[in-house]
Amino acid sequence: MIQRFRFGLPLPTDSVVQEIPVSAGPVPFLTAEEDGWAYRMAPDAIVYGLGEMPRGINKRGWHYETNNTDESEHGENRLSYYAAHNFLLISPADGSECIGIFIDFPGKVSYDIGYTRHDTLRFATAEPNYALYLITAPTAAEVAKRFRQLIGPSYIPPKWAFGLAQSRFGYKTEADIREVAAQYKANGLPLDMICMDIEYMQDYADFTVNKERFPDLTKLSADLKAQGIRLVPIIDA
């Protein structure tokens, strides 16, 4: 079962592809608080989700933020990394019904997943304009399946994207890229793609190319492709 609740005037994000009617009744499972929501967790419940985040697969016992911002340092004590995936899956150890929580909101969301109180999950959005989806199912796998149906299937990457990639920060010139390809070939190593970080840009601005250091990015890409190597420039957005 999927229920949708709307608060304020949510900004359209196109994150959801299914038409789910807005539920008028009270929000089940959750308790409204002054700045968000609380959920009472079973003692051995496991909490999955939030995408690429610090710590382990079970998110219980820490607090997090999702805000789509650069994080220059990675470590166990960080509150977030780059991306925002505002989906939680709560799986009770006793085999009772599993619950999925999806917050459709493009801004900052804060989570306290058993950090302040081991038995309490709390979350709050920076603004009171968002859509909240609750998904219930007998198993965690079924919750995940229904969530995927809600947001639509992922794109299918090209076959070469499953190959070997050489990626690092610090390739400053076209010559650096060509040298990487040459050294792989000289050492008899397979190479399917070279990923470039922000050094190829003009003043680190998206959708720009530093013409002094990369005078002809189109030709560089074509030359590498002729060798069976794809050039993958980062878009730091």
Question: Residue locations for each model-derived region?
Answer:
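Aromatic-lined carbohydrate-binding/catalytic grooves of carbohydrate-active enzymes
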Residues: 155-237
